[in-house]
Design a protein with these regions (language model features):
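Residue-level signature of catalytic and energy-coupling elements of molecular machines
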Residues: 22, 82, 131, 171, ...
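Conserved inter-motif catalytic segment of the P-loop NTP-binding fold
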Residues: 90, 98-101, 108-197
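Detector for small/aliphatic-rich hydrophobic stretches
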Residues: 2-5, 16-93, 113, 117-121
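Conserved P-loop NTPase nucleotide-binding/switch module
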Residues: 167-248
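Conserved small/polar residues in nucleotide/adenosyl-binding loops
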Residues: 252-258
Length: 258
């Protein structure tokens, strides 16, 4: 039977507490705690020692291969630049920006110019017809971009397993939810848990994933601040509604270059 509990989460840094507090002990912000109800399914019983279920194996640095694996060329000079020379296989990239600034269009335009890569574009906000209309306005030379409209993380993994893509796009992380958490999509807990699960998937399969995320009125990524520390790279898409210019600003964690 699922266990249910109530926690309070800081909207600024993601710190949680069993009770509401006025000042966050982690980041020092005032009145940032909101209530979240979490229901987690019971995990499968494991041996007390854990030895029988261990899948990882310690190895020496000399036994590790793939250290010089080339980055994926995004066929966009500016995007390659802010990514440090291209997309790192197995990396998790967060692209943030104001709603309507052009995040989805930028990503769709980019993946449609990757003729040698199979891309799975997961849309949780727009229908397949809406994406088709957007794509028709973009000159492209790729027909190997698969579109699926889905918001369940478990179903997303099924689609990935069946299609085996070279690159996964999730638009947007605020629309995705996992069945193991009884909370609405976009909540602090859902965003954090889904992002952590996607990061684990990216590392285990060496599949790069680009998450699209919205920013709030304060100019930060919507969801817990800890989301920016889960991903390998944060790209923030900035601009002005009165001009056509768009400026990609990059913040890259050291983990992306390991």
């Amino acid at each position: 039977m699922a266990k249910e509990k109530t926690v309070y989460v800081c909207t600024n840094c993601g710190q949680d507490s069993p009770k509401w507090v006025g000042k966050c002990p982690s980041c020092g912000a005032w009145n940032t705690y909101v209530e979240e109800i979490i229901r987690k399914e019971p995990a499968n019983k494991r041996p007390v020692s854990g030895l029988e279920s261990v899948k990882s194996k310690p190895v020496t640095l000399n036994d590790i291969t793939g250290g010089d694996e080339p980055r994926i060329d995004m066929h966009d000079e500016e995007l390659n630049r802010v990514l440090g020379g291209g997309l790192v296989p197995g990396s998790l990239v967060l692209l943030g920006g104001e709603p309507g600034i052009g995040k989805s269009t930028l990503v769709l335009q980019t993946v449609l110019h990757l003729p040698d890569k199979k891309v799975l574009y997961i849309s949780g906000e727009e229908s397949a017809r809406q994406l088709k209309l957007r794509a028709d306005r973009i000159p492209h030379n790729s027909s190997d971009c698969l579109i699926v409209c889905e918001t369940s993380l478990e179903q997303i993994y099924v689609h990935i397993k069946n299609t085996r893509p070279d690159l996964v796009i999730i638009d947007s992380i605020q629309t995705i939810s996992t069945e193991t958490i009884d909370s609405s999509p976009g909540s602090l807990v859902q965003v954090r848990e889904c992002s952590a699960s996607i990061l684990k998937f990216a590392k285990e399969t060496n599949t790069p994933v680009i998450l699209i995320g919205h920013i709030n009125k304060e100019g930060s990524i919507a969801g817990p601040k800890v989301l920016e520390h889960i991903v390998d790279t944060v790209l923030q898409f900035e601009g002005d509604q009165h001009y056509m210019y768009r400026i990609p600003v990059s913040y890259t964690h050291l983990r992306a270059h390991e």
